[in-house]
Design a protein with these regions (language model features):
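An acidic/histidine-cluster motif and surrounding catalytic segment
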Residues: 1-118, 124-153
Length: 153
């Protein structure tokens, strides 16, 4: 099972997602069985729904990039070590998402789809995926698409 601690910073998020905790509960329930590596494990992560100013500060502090971005991931484990964890209850890390960037990318049409793309991408980083090499990018992208198809029905 995968659970999210949801933190909301700013009022704009509630215009698009009335109850962020319920939103994540429904989405994560659908994908908890998706990862065979996670069978029998309880994963928890924190997601911060924030604004461009806050995410810009985080991006500058942790990635040395002085601009806002749609999503940042802070995995608790390296990609290789994640597979070796034997514990049943695992805190996998943190995700931050930016309202303004997601809203711009959605062209104000399908905000929730763009939001799902962002946090799913972040979640995959938390469970050990990356896109440094081309083959890893395509593998990660394929998994993102499968998850998005599953949760947007």
């Amino acid at each position: 099972m995968i659970k999210a601690n949801v933190e909301v910073s700013g009022k704009l998020w509630h215009k698009k997602i009335k109850s962020p905790k319920k939103y994540f509960y429904k989405k994560l329930k659908k994908i908890s069985k998706f990862f065979p590596l996670l069978k029998g494990k309880n994963l928890t992560f924190t997601i911060l729904l924030t604004n461009s100013l806050n995410i810009k500060k985080l991006n500058k502090k942790f990635r040395n990039r002085n601009k806002p971005t749609d999503v940042l991931s802070f995995p608790e484990f390296s990609p290789n070590s994640f597979k070796l964890i034997k514990k049943k209850n695992i805190y996998i890390g943190d995700i931050a998402t930016c309202y303004e960037i997601i809203n711009i990318r959605s062209n104000k049409n399908n905000f929730l789809l763009e939001f799902d793309k962002a946090w799913v991408h972040g979640l995959l980083h938390l469970v050990g995926y990356n896109h440094i090499k081309n083959r890893d990018y395509f593998k990660m992208n394929k998994i993102e698409e499968k998850i998005l198809n599953l949760i947007t029905k």
